[in-house]
């Protein structure tokens, strides 16, 4: 598909996820179902690095809703709740950041997140590096 054509119909939400190769087909099928239920007129484009388990998703909701926060929430839920059922990660290669930090628990256990916080506090005791990008400390 042509990226310019896809991006010409905003809003377009981009996602970067990773999951086991054996789960790819099932995840895409389940995502099509979840996204289709949330946005019957929406369009889903899937690109990626299938050999390493990374997918790039371009979601165009085409929603009649005027509430951009509600549209984004529904799009995020369709991607990440489906991803959780397939034991995927919310970021394949583009990091967590503010957009994904509320979904980090899907990819990492509470123990792993606690360790990440501890490392952050140890390496950045004054919290000046990337404040609030992955989690609040």
Describe the residue ranges of each PLM region.
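Short amphipathic alpha-helical interaction segments
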Residues: 67, 71, 75, 96, ...
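Activity-critical C-terminal alpha-helical subdomain
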Residues: 101-137
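Hydrophobic, well-ordered secondary-structure elements that form the walls
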Residues: 57, 79, 94, 124
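Alpha-helix capping/hinge segments and adjacent helical runs
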Residues: 84-96, 125-129
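A glycine-rich phosphate-binding loop feature that marks nucleotide/adenosyl-phosphate handling sites
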Residues: 47-54, 93-103, 132-137
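C-terminal substrate-recognition/cap domain of FAD-linked oxidoreductases
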Residues: 1-75, 82, 86
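Alpha-helix-loop-beta-strand connector modules within alpha/beta enzyme cores
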Residues: 77-79, 118-119
């Amino acid at each position: 598909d042509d990226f310019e054509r896809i991006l010409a119909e905003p809003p377009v939400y981009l996602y970067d996820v990773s999951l086991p190769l054996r789960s790819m087909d099932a995840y895409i099928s389940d995502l099509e179902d979840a996204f289709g239920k949330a946005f019957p007129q929406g369009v889903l484009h899937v690109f990626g690095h299938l050999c390493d388990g990374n997918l790039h998703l371009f979601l165009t909701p085409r929603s009649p809703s005027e509430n951009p926060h509600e549209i984004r929430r529904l799009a995020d839920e369709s991607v990440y709740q489906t991803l959780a059922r397939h034991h995927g990660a919310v970021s394949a290669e583009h990091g967590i950041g503010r957009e994904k930090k509320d979904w980090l628990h899907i990819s990492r256990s509470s123990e792993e997140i606690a360790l990440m916080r501890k490392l952050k506090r140890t390496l950045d005791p004054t919290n000046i590096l990337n404040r609030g990008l992955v989690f609040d400390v």
